Amino acid sequence: MGAKESRIGFLSYEEALRRVTDVELKRLKDAFKRTCGLSYYMSQHCFIREVLGDGVPPKVAEVIYCSFGGTSKGLHFNNLIVGLVLLTRGKDEEKAKYIFSLFSSESGSYVVREEMERMLHVVDGKVPDTLRKCFSEGEKVNYEKFRNWLLLNKDAFTFSRWLLSGGVYVTLTDDSDTPTFYQTLAGVTHLEESDIIDLEKRYWLLKAQSRTGRFDLETFGPLVSPPIRPSLSEGLFNAFDENRDNHIDFKEISCGLSACCRGPLAERQKFCFKVFDVDRDGVLSRVELKDMVVALLEVWKDNRTDDIPELHMDLSDIVERILNAHDTTKVGHLTLEDYQIWSVKNVLANEFLNLLFQVCHIVLGLRPATPEEEGQIIRGWLERESRYGLQPGHNWFIISMQWWQQWKEYVKYDASPVVIEPSSVLNGGKFSFGTAAHPIEHGEDRISNNLGYMNTTEEKYSDNISSASEASESTGSGFLYSGTPGADMCFARQHNTSDNNNQCLLGANGNILLHLNPQKPGAIDNQPLVTQEPVKATSLTLEGGRLKRTPQLIHGRDYEMVPEPVWRALYHWYGSNLALPRPVIKNSKTDIPELELFPRYLLFLRQQPATRTQQSNIWVNMGNVPSPNAPLKRVLAYTGCFSRMQTIKEIHEYLSQRLRIKEEDMRLWLYNSENYLTLLDDEDHRLEYLKIQDEQHLVIEVRNKDMSWPEEMSFIANSSKIDRHKVPTEKGATGLSNLGNTCFMNSSIQCVSNTQPLTQYFISGRHLYELNRTNPIGMKGHMAKCYGDLVQELWSGTQKNVAPLKLRWTIAKYAPRFNGFQQQDSQELLAFLLDGLHEDLNRVHEKPYVELKDSDGRPDWEVAAEAWDNHLRRNRSIVVDLFHGQLRSQVKCKTCGHISVRFDPFNFLSLPLPMDSYMHLEITVIKLDGTTPIRYGLRLNMDEKYTGLKKQLSDLCGLKSEQILFAEVHSSNIKNFPQDNQKVRLSVSGFLCAFEIPIPASPVSACSPIQTDCSSSPSTNGLFTLTTNGDLPRPIFIPNGMPNTVVPCGTEKNVTNGIVNGHMPPLPDDPFTGYIIAVHRKMMRTELYFLSSQKNRPSLFGMPLIVPCTVHTRKKDLYDAVWIQVSRLASPLPPQEASNHAQDCDDSMGYQYPFTLRVVQKDGNSCAWCPWYRFCRGCKIDCGEDRAFIGNACIAVDWDPTALHLRYQTSQERVVEEHESVEQSRRAQAEPINLDSCLRAFTSEEELGENEMYYCSKCKTHCLATKKLDLWRLPPILIIHLKRFQFVNGRWIKSQKIVKFPRESFDPSAFLVPRDPTLCQHKPLTPQGDDFSELRIPAGDVKKVDIQSSAGEEDVLLSKSPSSLSANVTSSPKGSPSSSRKSGASCPSSKNSSPNSSPRTLGRNKGRLRLPQIGSKNKLSNSKENLDTSKENGAGQICELADTLNRRHVLGGSQPELVTPLDHEITLANGFLYEHEACGNGYSNGQLGNHSEEDSTDDQREETHSKPIYNLYAISCHSGILGGGHYVTYAKNPNCKWYCYNDSSCKELHPDEIDTDSAYILFYEQQGIDCAQFLPKTDGKKMADTSSMDEDFESDYKKYCVLQ
């Protein structure tokens, strides 16, 4: 595509320069510098975008770039100039040589036909027929022959048509002058263009303070009040807000300031009249006059001390006197003219006008017209502040006296003092804005209660300057003129202007000329007032610097003080190198407001972890604990000044925002010494109370990525060297250190720790009497011992936090899946913890064999009692007593109706949350009648298609489905039309809108004559009255990229055949779609450009339109249709409304339409009809009566610049009405569910799918079935797990559904299986005592566990250990009564857990035992072969195998499960049985009857059973994203107070502060239980010797730890 060097060697750079003027060359150089920066080369991308424009086809642009000499390095400026001169001012001979060079060979001496045809195919897509004449004599031609042929065939191809035929369409310079936004505003106001440019910067800074993004009354009010009274703020806002949209745009504030401050007196009084005309009816009623008088008297009292008669008169008398003297209509009100006559000589009205004058300049940013005016404005503001006195919470600013005196001379400031009363710069003294000198006292520092001086001006303003420039509607030099005074003052902040000032005071002979007019001062220089900081650290606060203490600064001699509004104005007008804000506070002793000049200067340290060596490693399996040989290094990072009255909480919040660190991830420590730090955790303490003085060191601690705290980890690592300081705390209110993403463990431990019966069991040491160190599936008692030691520390009441090192190590040893530093599932850890505690404390040391029988139609109570008895024979512990309940699971065959029932134990209920099966969609409907768009809210199925969306939306908005066109709008244009058969997408490139389109009618032949009535009524503009047999003509042509809402009769060929070189000619013979796309467009002018086509670039804005257009639509109809839709955006003011414009010279509405329609391509930038080399922005559509043949093009609505600047209401673009369905759908989407609904869903009947066929023992085959779970027995401690992590559609997702649950008196009895009281009998079903040696199971009645092996991998299906059985983890094969719950969608080989589970848990490991997880497909088959072969083994083998595999699996780190078929097979069911509860109410486990509770009576048990009411005592909450996030616990202490356990932090809080929305696990305790009844008797029992356990632990501990 061209050579690497320029092909324009025939035109030299020097010759090209002679053809451009100096002005043009400077513009080109500046444009090149703006585009390329300091580089001498322009990239190809910049060349295409900035020089040629986006309308040139990419292939053509690439050819031109290469022909100019562009390479991969770029295009040199000299080559660019030569190329531009050739294109715009080259001679035909030179252009012919250029075209020849494009096709010539490397040598440039001839053109080869094959090469030329190849390039023409690339550029034009075809080869002209006349080309064969050029090569009639051979395959090569020289320049002469090529030139002769080219001049005879100038229209042969694109380049020849562009450069040789039809004249020049692009020039080097564009002399047209489109008015800029500022020029337009300056033409209709009394403001200069420079004033408007300067005012715009201020406007965007003020608007940036809005919370809504609009300059509304909520934003405007605090800015002007005080000094404007709140009663007048709304009226003043309305006076600016001409279009009454509750938003002051820049045009309105410019015109309002012009009318209020720069116009003649009569016009200024007009503005005041609008302030008092509340109802905007053009007159002041009696009520409005009374309110006006009240407001004016308040203004007078605030600003003047003079006495006037009106102060002593009755309000009604004043109103009557005004009406009697000036009411010309004699109807009891004042017109505008009446008000003007009254206000001319009225002192109250004039004083109000003076106040507005001050506010408009100081607050709203208008620059004073003269220095004298500036001095009067500032003086008036300071006089009023002197009457108010110092107000706590306000900031005052220090200004160097040297600059202040120079400014006073410049503005001719009156030197008489302005006294502020009371003054508190000195204790009880007064200060004035005069020359009186007062020293600063050093004895008592004055401090700020405005944290960090966040309201100061300098930083906030500098951060927002860019937004002001971006808002400008002209680019290049249109916004900021570097030579204007306003620009210099706003951006030249750092230079010292004293030299300039001295020069201004010297005459030509060197004599001082003090009598001359003083020179305008430069930027405010406060540097002499502050000390040079020796500490080189970043300051986090904006106090500006520490004031000098020596020599002593004296007020009135060294500095002056001004209130914040005055400082902002001076800063805006002059700039400053240093802002010195100082706040006003109340003295804690005298309660007198005072100004703090010397706030506390604090030094902040940050941790810098030391580099670890191989010897100083981290703890293996323990967390990120550093070595004691590598202590944490702390370095000075920041400084900051804060008030002594500031609380720790306020400082913490400020630092969090300033450093962009989450509050929960940062803590503050008081640094006393290297080894003595104090955590500042009491947020209500003030610096004064803590006796924190200047230059005190504080440590900013930030969490590690693994959620541990560096200081804590360092303390743990050095705990042998540093004495732990005992701090008395509430028992149980002790946190747990995060050892590296162990918040999941801490949360579960805290919940279990606050289970009072279990905690009392451990605190009393009873666990040491029941340690089972011989249990093959236990943990040798280590789990119980470590947990017991930790509980005793937590409830000792001597430590604020402890590190659970031993328990963490024990868990990691026996469950490696919890090892490492990744976030885990708190529920999984809880299950493992309870399981480990149970096995270590199991009172059954030799487990007997039990038999699992089929229900065979037996009563539920009998089967349940049998299952419970079987479990109790093998499992007895404090964990079983407290946490275990029983579930009934029944499966009903849909073929024969046979019901199979089994009962399983559970220790927590896992309730699947209903996943969001609906998506919430809000869509805006835009109608053709121009009414305000309406937003509708819908709830759609997740797989809903746009067809269904149309139907639902049609029912809401009243349009037929055929009238709705969906479009994705992005960057003010339509990017895509979704097809009806596509699924609705929430994440689209833009936002989805629904446009109304004309109803398609029956198709009409384009060739047949159509009789139409072309007359149109004014209401329809002739757009919808064209009929053929009473119907609208059916659209039969669909342009490229448009939706097939209507059936096309044409083909795609109609479109593509018409495209030649990017040129789309008119297609008058092609039918239309019935509508076309219209986009709003404005021209953005730049003064730095390369070609005339790029001086004014189109820019799209606003919302695109859908305009009706058929084969019969006239051009005038298009204008009418567009105006109908946009008139609400550009409505002229009501004729009776007084305008704020100084002179309304806007004639944009004088003609019919304030815009012009042009035919453009889909991108809206270039013409759809003209070829690219014409550089046409769109052919104009005349507003005439002839037909509008638009074809498949779009139209651009080009707004007249004056109308756009003065009449177009940008804020109205975003105005939509919200239909009631929006709130309804939002509420439905976010509506929480209650716990009862979760339980109801859990116990509801479900149908098993075809992939979950149930093997029916009656039908002897797999059948379809239904399944139902029910609660049979509830434990004293009920744990409810809300399954937020679920596997849906192949991926893990977290449900954010809010679940409402009761805290007190939770009654789940409605979900218990009803009992038949006639069958209840207290019949012993188990032998008395602990000896089960005589219990044997016949071999013929049991089935073996099927062990499936595949590729060397072993999948063993086992029973869960008793404490690991959750309600939803029912461990039976598909179709069995205990198969997985319907609502818990699962993934293969994964347990019902979070995706944070270890890979060891989720996958198969060779040589390891793997347990099937919930929903797993790897379950025991129900096939007949398995059933038959399983009869060979006996129950003894089964139980032996189960115990062995359980032990091996626990040691491997996973939770065991046993899954066996119910029919004819054994299941090691974890059920309880009490002899007396075979038909009990099932409300509670009550007390065990076979070992230590023989003395309990049946009456006590019956009482317990009759109260299944629970109270909440602990919550584990998960916040954040899936796969991460954070766990915290809320628990109720025995002192009846709630505490928040956030790792090592434990704080008391009010119950209403609990974050219940993120609840994950709920812990309920049954009302009325006696903790003592669960404590076993230790009489006659021997405490276990744990010395060997300690030795074992220490031995293993040292293997994993490098600490000594």
Swiss-Prot record:
Listed Low complexity bias regions: 1371-1399
Pfam families named among the record's database cross-references: DUSP, EF-hand_5, Ubiquitin_3, UCH, USP32_N
CC annotations in GO: Golgi apparatus; Golgi membrane
SUPFAM superfamilies given in the database record: Cysteine proteinases (SSF54001), DUSP-like (SSF143791), EF-hand (SSF47473)
Domain DUSP: 369-585
Residues that coordinate or bind Ca(2+) 1: 241, 243, 245, 247, 252
Segments of skewed composition (Polar residues): 1360-1370, 1415-1424
Domain named EF-hand: residues: 91-126, 228-263, 264-299
Comp. bias intervals (Basic and acidic residues): 1491-1504
Catalytic activity: Thiol-dependent hydrolysis of ester, thioester, amide, peptide and isopeptide bonds formed by the C-terminal Gly of ubiquitin (a 76-residue protein attached to proteins as an intracellular targeting signal)
Family: Belongs to the peptidase C19 family.
Protein name: Ubiquitin carboxyl-terminal hydrolase 32
Organism in which the protein naturally occurs: Mus musculus (Mouse)
